[in-house]
């Protein structure tokens, strides 16, 4: 069992989910139903989130996600690293590339096809995704995984810092032309980098 998300990072807000990581020896649909029943009996069940997986399935997980999974999880019972496949630096690089591709596609698709209000509603999630990408890019560049947004912000420069700062400025109203343009140009630059 482990913990992820804002509770792990010390960034709990009024809308924060409680992200629990649970690995079950042999996960079944009955286990899922029982887990759901337990969660629904707890206070604030609507904030339950996280990662639930069978041990054998986790051992076969795509190495692309393992670097992020290990760094974004604090063990509380057992050792997650003993349950996952090995990963290489190339896997972490490909995780960043894949995530950048997905973010870029989301921005382009929403900007063209969504109403302006809907696009502005999508932007906070896009900036949140950028935070996770920045965490991993910073790790690849420095070997240090900054656990919190504030810690990462202190370590960033230039447009990277500008993107994370915008994510942190949740009180500032979202402005489509400004905020979509910043994230779009950041994605372009990151995707077209020759190396990570």
Language model region names:
Residues 3, 15-17:
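Alpha-helical architecture
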Residues 19-21, 25:
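Non-catalytic interfacial helical region
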Residues 1-7:
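Short gly/ser-rich loop at a beta-strand->alpha-helix junction or flexible surface loop bordering the NTP-binding
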Residues 8-14, 25-196:
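Catalytic core of pol beta-like nucleotidyltransferases
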């Amino acid at each position: 069992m482990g913990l992820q998300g804002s509770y792990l990072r010390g960034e709990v807000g009024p809308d924060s989910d409680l992200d629990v990581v649970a690995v079950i020896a042999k996960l079944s649909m009955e286990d899922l139903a029982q887990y759901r029943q337990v969660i629904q009996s707890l206070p604030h069940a609507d904030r339950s989130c996280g990662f639930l997986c069978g041990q054998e399935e986790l051992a076969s997980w795509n190495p692309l996600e393992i670097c992020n999974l290990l760094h974004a999880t604090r063990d509380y019972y057992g050792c997650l690293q003993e349950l996952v496949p090995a990963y290489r630096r190339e896997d972490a690089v490909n995780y960043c590339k894949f995530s950048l591709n997905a973010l870029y596609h989301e921005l382009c698709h929403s900007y063209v096809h969504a109403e302006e209000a809907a696009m502005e509603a999508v932007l906070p999630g896009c900036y949140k995704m950028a935070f996770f990408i920045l965490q991993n890019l910073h790790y690849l560049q420095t070997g240090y995984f900054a656990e919190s947004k504030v810690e990462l912000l202190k370590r960033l420069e230039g447009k990277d810092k500008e993107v994370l700062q915008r994510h942190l400025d949740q009180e500032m109203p979202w402005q489509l032309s400004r905020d979509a343009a910043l994230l779009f140009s950041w994605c372009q630059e990151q995707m077209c980098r020759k190396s990570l």
